[in-house]
Regions:
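Hydrophobic alpha-helical segments within soluble ligand-binding/sensing domains
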Residues: 122-125
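Nucleotide and nucleotide-moiety/phosphate-recognizing core
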Residues: 2-117, 127, 131, 135-141, ...
């Protein structure tokens, strides 16, 4: 394994962040879709997200020819920016080299959407990132988890678990998200968006 800590300043280093909540009760909930994708990516790369630093669990990896850090902030969703900012500062990573994966209620399960910048769209984890990073100009991969049913509280919806059908759709979308992340790490943002920003029918 290459050394990250001998030379923290590396213009090619990427920070891939999955957003979610820590705790067994949140595993496989809609709000933890970001954790799910990053953990699946780590598994594919033969890495474990087990190292601790700056309020986060992380793994060091290589994606293609690029160095990358896979990060799961352990601050709970609403304070995710604290951990991300600390990693950016320590490793001298710019916002454009941070790729954030998170849940989006405006997309149906099975869909994903890649954006290079944008508002928080009501997502508290992204609000925290924007506040601590000082910019909204960072790439993100949004994972569809579906709109909340009528008369259901939003928190209950996003903290709820996927049913079997939607979990299957998430698995497929997660595989596509991983391929998209690989393209993005390689600088092929347009290719990733053209290939994966396709709406799937229910």
């Amino acid at each position: 394994m290459f050394s990250f800590f001998k030379n923290r300043k590396d213009s090619n280093m990427k920070l891939i962040v999955g957003l979610g909540n820590l705790g067994r009760e949140y595993v496989n909930t809609r709000h933890n879709a970001g954790f799910y994708v990053v953990e699946k990516l780590a598994y594919e790369l033969g890495e474990d997200i087990t190292e601790r630093k700056y309020k986060g669990l992380f793994a060091k990896a290589r994606i293609g020819n690029e160095k990358a850090i896979l990060l799961e902030p352990q601050t709970y969703m609403n304070n995710s920016g604290e951990s991300v900012r600390a990693f950016m500062d320590y490793f001298k990573i710019e916002a454009k080299d941070v790729i954030v994966v998170y849940d989006d209620i405006n997309l149906e399960p099975g869909n994903l959407r890649i954006r290079l910048k944008g508002s928080a769209g009501g997502h508290n984890g992204i609000k925290s990132l924007i506040a601590h990073m000082g910019t909204s100009d960072f790439p993100r991969v949004k994972m569809g988890v579906g709109e909340k049913p009528a008369r259901m509280d939003l928190a209950d919806h996003v903290l709820g678990h996927f049913n079997a059908e939607d979990k299957k759709k998430l698995d497929e979308a997660a595989s596509h998200a991983i391929e998209a992340i690989k393209l993005m790490v390689d600088g092929q943002y347009d290719t990733a968006m053209n290939k994966y920003n396709v709406k799937k029918t229910k």
